Amino acid sequence: MKIYGKNVALEALKGNKKIHKIYLSNKFKDEEILSLIERKKISTKLLDNRELDKMCKGLHQGIILEVEDIKTYSFDEIIPNITTEYPLIVILDHLEDPHNLGAIVRSSEAFGVDAIIIPNDRSVQITSTVVKTSVGTIEKVKIVNVPNINNAIRKLKDLGYWIVGTDMEGTNYTEIDYKTKIGLVIGNEGKGISKVTADNCDYIAKIPMKGTVNSLNASVACGIFLSEINRSRGI
């Protein structure tokens, strides 16, 4: 896959990611990145910005990397083997916007989420836009692909997890006890959590709001919940 942008490039170059080739603007000047490229002896090709623009739709900042695909995992590879005291899993109910997924990945890395579960079908998957929006943090978060999120939720419950769904109606999110194994469900941008998924949740929680807006962007809501979970756990 192709990833782009200075921060993403820096994360990839500092890590162990296999980089096949780098396309650079002939005006690229970032000395730290250039030094890492030279040190790692990675094949590069100089192009003008118009050629780089044709290669990607986003803001590339003069650098595009051709890399191996981001690794994803199955449920059984990751979830049963989590050893943190209070595991925290984010479950995405058919999100569609790659910017939302990237922002959720970034927040998840910041707040110490153990894994993110996304369904295989009818859901955004990992793209160059997701990687760019996550500012490279996607390499530090376990992404778990599942055929069916409700089957995954039932398996989480069998492992002792409490499932918290997010919605405009429900218990105040500050009143829930998060000092246990938690699976946090974030709904689709337009439809929210499906009825079947909501029925599988132990709690439905809301973020109280005072303004005229009655809902938040999925990634914003996720960040607020993750912050509250950490606060309630004394982190």
What are these regions (language model features)?
Residues 1-80:
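N-terminal positively charged helical leader segments and presequences
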Residues 10, 15-16, 132-135, 198-235:
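Structured adenosyl-cofactor binding patch, chiefly the S-adenosyl-L-methionine
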Residues 29, 123-129, 191-197:
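Short, glycine/polar-rich helix-capping loops at beta-to-alpha or helix-loop-helix junctions
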Residues 48, 93, 119-120, 141, ...:
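Short beta->alpha connector loops at strand-helix junctions that form conserved
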Residues 50-55, 72-73, 149-153, 171-173, ...:
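A short acidic, often aromatic-flanked loop/helix-cap motif at beta-alpha or helix-coil junctions
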Residues 164-217:
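Active-site/ligand-binding-proximal alpha/beta "capping" segment
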